[in-house]
Amino acid sequence: MAKQLKLTWTKSFIGCPETQRATIKSLGFKKLQQSLIKEDCPQIRGQISKVQHLLMVEEL
């Protein structure tokens, strides 16, 4: 696996359940189209899997 992941929040969470909104916020996103670099670990991968339809993920 890659050591880091580049996450980009690409789609709005309007109409999504509150749990998915909380997951986006817990990943550290504040604005749409924001990109973050996160360490690749099972916890982050689990969060990504819950909101994969809202994110674009690249391995670095």
From Swiss-Prot:
- Record's superkingdom? Bacteria
Report TM segments: none
Q: Name one GO molecular function term.
A: structural constituent of ribosome
Q: Keywords of this protein's UniProt record, alphabetized?
A: Ribonucleoprotein, Ribosomal protein
* InterPro entries the record matches: Ribo_uL30_ferredoxin-like_sf, Ribosomal_uL30_bac-type, Ribosomal_uL30_ferredoxin-like
Q: Which Pfam families match?
A: Ribosomal_L30
Q: Which GO terms describe its biological process?
A: translation
Tell me which GO cellular component terms the UniProt record holds. cytosolic large ribosomal subunit
Q: Which Gene3D superfamilies match?
A: Ribosomal protein L30, ferredoxin-like fold domain (3.30.1390.20)
- Subunit structure, as described in the record: Part of the 50S ribosomal subunit.
PANTHER family noted in UniProt: LARGE RIBOSOMAL SUBUNIT PROTEIN UL30M (PTHR15892:SF2), MITOCHONDRIAL RIBOSOMAL PROTEIN L30 (PTHR15892)
Under NCBIfam families, the record lists: rpmD_bact
Concerning HAMAP family, the annotation shows: Ribosomal_uL30_B
Family statement: Belongs to the universal ribosomal protein uL30 family.
> How is this protein named in the record?
Large ribosomal subunit protein uL30
- What is the originating organism of this protein? Syntrophomonas wolfei subsp. wolfei (strain DSM 2245B / Goettingen)
In the UniProt record, what gene is named as encoding this protein?
A: rpmD
